[in-house]
Amino acid sequence: MQSITIRNTVIGEGLPKIIVPLMAAGEKELLEEIEAVNRLRPDIIEWRADVYEHVDSLDAVKDMLEMLRKAAGATPLLFTFRTHKEGGNKVIDDRFYIELLKTAIETKHIDLADVELFTGEAEVKLIVKTAEDNGVYVVMSNHDFHQTPKKEEIISRLRNMQAYGAHIPKIAVMPQSTEDVFVLLDATHTMKTQYADRPIITMSMAGTGLISRLAGEVFGSACTFGAGKEASAPGQIPVEELRSVLSILNKHM
């Protein structure tokens, strides 16, 4: 598996990289939040644009990205609009979703862009091409907030992301039992050892799945999400606690 270096962050080697989301709705609050997040020393900062109150305006998004880029400094910036059907905050038209992603990418203020696998093959390939033309990496994602698919289905989705050109495939699933967490971890390990030629991100959500957010280095997930001011998904824990556990595991492996 090849690692990816974005600015000074190497994804796919050593400790899983910590991604911290920005979840504020307003401009002033976002700028205050990113300053607080910077103090946590994340490896990557994610802007959850589906929470932004002016996300319907492409000009407002471009202006906000310029400010966030400046505030993030040397820390890689991930742009994410999580659709409502995959757990996001806002319902938007599919065509606007694609236009929003293209606009964010073409500002060149971001380092990574999240695009959901089930947007459609042609659409995600268009986003991948746009990203590559602008020096941006693609995190291709899928989120199931209701269940954990079978191991074979999890692997199939990750392999499809890889085939569609994702630089970093990502899947998050909801466990209904401890056994479901084992399924996700087993699928992650199999994907990493048998199929992946690039970093992957996987997680089992909620408290039941917490171990998957902590043991990525063991099973093969290259990044994990920690809560800054506010968690963006069930099961995220504060960054300082997360970093401590990741460091302990890394030290004794």
Curated annotation (Swiss-Prot):
Annotated Pfam families: DHquinase_I
Active-site residues, Swiss-Prot/TrEMBL: H143 (proton donor/acceptor), K170 (schiff-base intermediate with substrate)
Similarity comment: family membership: Belongs to the type-I 3-dehydroquinase family.
GO molecular function, a single term: 3-dehydroquinate dehydratase activity
InterPro entries: 3-dehydroquinate_DH_AS, Aldolase_TIM, DHquinase_I, Type-I_3-dehydroquinase
Record's catalysed reaction(s): 3-dehydroquinate = 3-dehydroshikimate + H2O
Its job: Involved in the third step of the chorismate pathway, which leads to the biosynthesis of aromatic amino acids. Catalyzes the cis-dehydration of 3-dehydroquinate (DHQ) and introduces the first double bond of the aromatic ring to yield 3-dehydroshikimate.
Enzyme Commission code: 4.2.1.10
GO biological process terms held by the UniProt record: 3,4-dihydroxybenzoate biosynthetic process; amino acid biosynthetic process; aromatic amino acid family biosynthetic process; chorismate biosynthetic process
Pathway as given in its UniProt record: Metabolic intermediate biosynthesis; chorismate biosynthesis; chorismate from D-erythrose 4-phosphate and phosphoenolpyruvate: step 3/7
TM annotation in the entry: none
Record keywords: Amino-acid biosynthesis, Aromatic amino acid biosynthesis, Lyase, Schiff base
Subunit and interaction comment: Homodimer.
Residues the entry annotates as binding 3-dehydroquinate: E46, W47, R48, R82, R213, S232, Q236
PANTHER family: 3-DEHYDROQUINATE DEHYDRATASE
Protein name: 3-dehydroquinate dehydratase
Highest taxon of the lineage: Bacteria
